Amino acid sequence: MSFYYRRIVHFQDTDAAGVVYFVNVLAICHEAYEASLAAFDINLKVFFSNQEIAIPIIHANVDFRRPMFCGDELTIELMPKTWGDDEFEISYQVFLKEVGKKWAARASTKHVCIHPQSKSRQKLSDEIRRWLLSFQTF
């Protein structure tokens, strides 16, 4: 199962050449991640300010197939996958409305669950495990 997030490319997302700046693709993907959490009724304010659990990104990558310009309508497909008790990875595909099923960019982020003060790994919260389970297909 996937989560879909729609967004328009804003002028601030682009570089001097008028295309989406590469780092901003990751920011757009992170917006999709946040939207999926919110759609699952996870309180974002509590989630991102939690003093007992933090889920930083430990690896990210992005590949590009075609340019994206200001005003382009994007659909971001988000597909999380669990990697054990304390980490998960999210794969993203970014589609341009006018191109259809061909992706413009692909990205992934790997997240690990830690305690914010000790920085030691810990198990994912029940809330995040439920969110991850909602994407599994049996």
Curated annotation (Swiss-Prot):
UniProt key word Acetylation: no
Enzyme category, top tier: hydrolase
Similarity comment: family membership: Belongs to the 4-hydroxybenzoyl-CoA thioesterase family. DHNA-CoA hydrolase subfamily.
Source organism superkingdom: Bacteria
Protein name according to UniProt: 1,4-dihydroxy-2-naphthoyl-CoA hydrolase
Annotated metabolic or biological route of this protein: Cofactor biosynthesis; phylloquinone biosynthesis; Quinol/quinone metabolism; 1,4-dihydroxy-2-naphthoate biosynthesis; 1,4-dihydroxy-2-naphthoate from chorismate: step 7/7
Organism of provenance: Trichodesmium erythraeum (strain IMS101)
Entries under InterPro entries matching the protein: DHNA_CoA_hydrolase, HotDog_dom_sf
Catalytic activity: 1,4-dihydroxy-2-naphthoyl-CoA + H2O = 1,4-dihydroxy-2-naphthoate + CoA + H(+)
Keyword annotations from UniProtKB, A to Z: Hydrolase
GO molecular function, one term: 1,4-dihydroxy-2-naphthoyl-CoA thioesterase activity
Upper taxonomic lineage: Bacteria, Bacillati, Cyanobacteriota, Cyanophyceae, Oscillatoriophycideae
Active site (record annotation): 15
EC number(s) from the headed UniProt entry: 3.1.2.28
Pfam families for the chain: 4HBT_2 (PF13279)
Disulfide bond found in the keyword field: no
Function description: Catalyzes the hydrolysis of 1,4-dihydroxy-2-naphthoyl-CoA (DHNA-CoA) to 1,4-dihydroxy-2-naphthoate (DHNA), a reaction involved in phylloquinone (vitamin K1) biosynthesis.
Single biological process term from Gene Ontology: phylloquinone biosynthetic process
